[in-house]
Amino acid sequence: MTEHDLFDLAPYIDHTQLDPLATRADIERCCGEAEQWKFAAVCVMPVWVKTAVQLLHRTPVKVCTVIGFPSGAHTSSTKLYEAQEAVDSGATELDVVINLGWLKEGNSEAVYRDIAQICAETGVTVKAILETTVLTEEEKQLAVDICLDAGVAFLKTSTGWRGGATVADVRLLKRLSRDRVGIKASGGIRTREQALELINAGATRLGTSRSLDLMQV
């Protein structure tokens, strides 16, 4: 076996089930797979956080959920309530979509307040979703600067609704953030080869619903 085959992807993976049609059986399957493969976390819709916590409470697998998903265009008070409710339900990681409209119009202060309040009030790991596929280079730089100032723990490339992670964007986020935070690549990660390329580019976490495919060597 090669070094490529032996590399353990499991600690990098947020095993994702964000299908709005998902049932309890789907969540049970997702959590069971995460426990079996020892993935870093599961990422589920807010309505399923309590269920995931109950299923995984005896395991080291973290429970993550999404906030302001997928548009980021919720009011700041709605996002904060959603985040606090998720944490009260047991989530220890939050993937929060930043307000892209405010970013594009240059309203940096509003974008900052929107994400900073969640970091400050919840005290858990916050991953800011930047939706890099719809941003210019200048907007990516601005988004990174704002999110670093706000206190996020990770920068996340994408929701997966407007395209996915690219090696180029992962490299860029790593460079712009100067290694101060983790980088989560998400969206369209379907093969082991893709996963390894993204990790080599600087990704420290991978969000994918195709986790089991990535584990095949």
Swiss-Prot record:
Keywords carried by this UniProt record: Cytoplasm, Lyase, Schiff base
Official protein name in the record: Deoxyribose-phosphate aldolase
- Matching Pfam families: DeoC
Q: Which SUPFAM superfamilies match?
A: Aldolase (SSF51569)
Q: Which family does the entry's similarity section mention?
A: Belongs to the DeoC/FbaB aldolase family. DeoC type 1 subfamily.
Source organism lineage?
Bacteria, Bacillati, Cyanobacteriota, Cyanophyceae, Acaryochloridales
Keyword Cytoplasm found: yes
What EC number(s) would the UniProt record show?
4.1.2.4
Instruction: Explain the purpose of this protein.
Output: Catalyzes a reversible aldol reaction between acetaldehyde and D-glyceraldehyde 3-phosphate to generate 2-deoxy-D-ribose 5-phosphate.
Gene Ontology molecular-function annotations: deoxyribose-phosphate aldolase activity
